[in-house]
Swiss-Prot record:
Protein name: S-adenosylmethionine synthase
Region described as Flexible loop: spans on this chain: 101-111
Residues that hold K(+) according to the record: 45
A GO term, aspect molecular function: methionine adenosyltransferase activity
Keyword Membrane (UniProt): no
Organism this protein belongs to: Pelodictyon phaeoclathratiforme (strain DSM 5477 / BU-1)
Residues annotated as binding Mg(2+): 19
Annotated transmembrane regions: none
Gene symbol of the encoding locus: metK
Cofactor: Mg(2+); K(+)
Role, per record: Catalyzes the formation of S-adenosylmethionine (AdoMet) from methionine and ATP. The overall synthetic reaction is composed of two sequential steps, AdoMet formation and the subsequent tripolyphosphate hydrolysis which occurs prior to release of AdoMet from the enzyme.
Length: 404
């Protein structure tokens, strides 16, 4: 095999990033609707800016949700609790513009009872294609760059909320990790970027000196804690708040909208994306549920040792339960003499990708031990609390391919 060397980069953002504030509010609203009425149809979008939250969208439900209370609770949990942030939980305006879902859409999703198979009664909420991916780069079968980027943001938030060190931290932050690969294997971390919102420099301390304190703290307490030491060398570059001062941030610094961080939510650019966002959508929307199912298929294929990498694409027509197409690609990493067609044939028999089957398999309309708000920061994949991360189909796949 010829030597192949390349660099690959993924980014993440904190729970206090404006777009993620919006995602979390949308999913918290969804959670409350589903708690009251598990058959709720929800498409909830949130807009956040200086001192203002606007929640809009379409809903069909028997539930009654207090948008004001939910939005303020989410903003409080994130940490926007000081007036100097210019976006504060108790004082920001909250406007609700939710209204009824179009009956034209609903008639295609909820089919007639006389259809014999219960899983054929629920059509896809829209057309589109969704992707799932898994690889052997990390124990959770996720690409390494996005995992490191997510964990940097989680660690930074953990430190901020504990309040024991780095007490100058504010909620908004971003990370980016560049890895060097050789023969498809991660060899080292080439660069790490962390930009974090912070308090102004203390009186008598220069901006340059303050930024040096922040840089050293981030490197020692965040980067070196998250990233394995054997991947960092003397040539690894650390870019900490590279533009300097980052005091103004959050929704006051940038407007936030639901659904603008779809690559952060998934695989960090290591796999294709169908374009549909997740947050604020109930599981009848295949943008969300089918993407979770596609990840489940890909992860089980890799966990079964059938391949080192796997991409799954599934597509739907609105109102039609069965997928229009299914495509599986193992990127020339299939094992045991298998090819993609053989793997796909068995996968299609084992994994039912009709929306109602997906919803039932993962209890997506009645989450147990998790909630949608949890998915809205730090990634929807690679986290064991979510049911689509289970690898319970490994034995069935192996048996079907005579590998058990």
């Amino acid at each position: 095999m010829s030597q192949t060397r390349y660099f690959f980069t993924s980014e993440s953002v904190s729970e206090g990033h404006p777009d993620k504030v919006a995602d979390q509010i949308s999913d918290a609203v969804l959670d409350d609707f589903l708690r009251q009425d598990s058959s709720s149809r929800v498409a909830c979008e949130t807009f956040v800016t200086t001192g203002q939250v606007i929640v809009g969208g379409e809903v069909t439900t028997k539930g009654i949700v207090d948008i004001q209370t939910i939005a303020r609770k989410v903003v409080t949990e994130i940490g926007y609790t000081k007036s100097e942030y210019m976006f504060e939980a108790n004082s920001c305006g909250v406007l609700s513009a939710l209204h009824s879902q179009s009956p034209d859409i609903n008639r295609g999703v909820d089919r007639k009872e006389e259809i014999a198979d219960e899983f054929d009664r629920v059509g896809a909420g829209d057309q589109g294609m969704m992707f799932g991916y898994a690889c052997t780069e990390t124990p959770v079968l996720m690409p390494a760059a996005i995992q490191f980027a997510q964990h940097l943001m989680k660690k930074l938030a953990e430190i901020r909320k504990e309040g024991k060190i780095m007490t100058y931290l504010r909620p908004d932050a971003k990370s980016q990790v560049t890895l060097e690969y050789e023969n498809e294997v991660v060899k080292r971390v080439d660069a790490v970027v962390v930009s974090t919102q912070h308090d102004p420099e203390p009186e008598g301390v220069s901006e340059a000196a303050w930024q040096e304190v922040i840089k050293n703290d981030i490197i020692e307490n965040v980067i070196k804690v998250v990233i394995p030491a054997d991947l960092i060398d003397e040539n690894t570059k650390f870019h900490i708040n590279p533009t300097g001062r980052f005091v103004i941030g959050g929704p006051h610094g940038d407007t936030g909208l639901t659904g603008r961080k779809i690559i952060v939510d998934t695989y960090g650019g290591a796999a294709p994306h169908g374009g549909g966002a997740f947050s604020g959508k109930d599981p009848s929307k295949v943008d969300r549920s089918a993407a979770y199912a596609a990840r489940h298929v890909a992860k089980n294929i890799v966990a079964a040792g059938l391949a080192d990498k796997c991409t799954v694409q599934v597509s739907y027509a609105i109102g039609v339960a069965r997928p229009v197409s299914i495509y599986i690609n193992t990127h020339d990493t299939a094992k045991h003499g298998l090819n993609d067609a053989q793997i796909q044939e068995k996968a299609e028999l084992i994994f039912d990708l009709r929306p109602a089957a997906i919803i039932k398999r993962f209890s997506l309309n009645k989450p147990e031990g998790w909630c949608y708000q949890q998915t809205a920061a730090y990634g929807h994949f690679g986290r064991d609390i979510f049911p689509w991360e289970k690898t319970e189909k490994v034995g069935e796949l192996k048996s079907a391919l005579n590998l058990a």
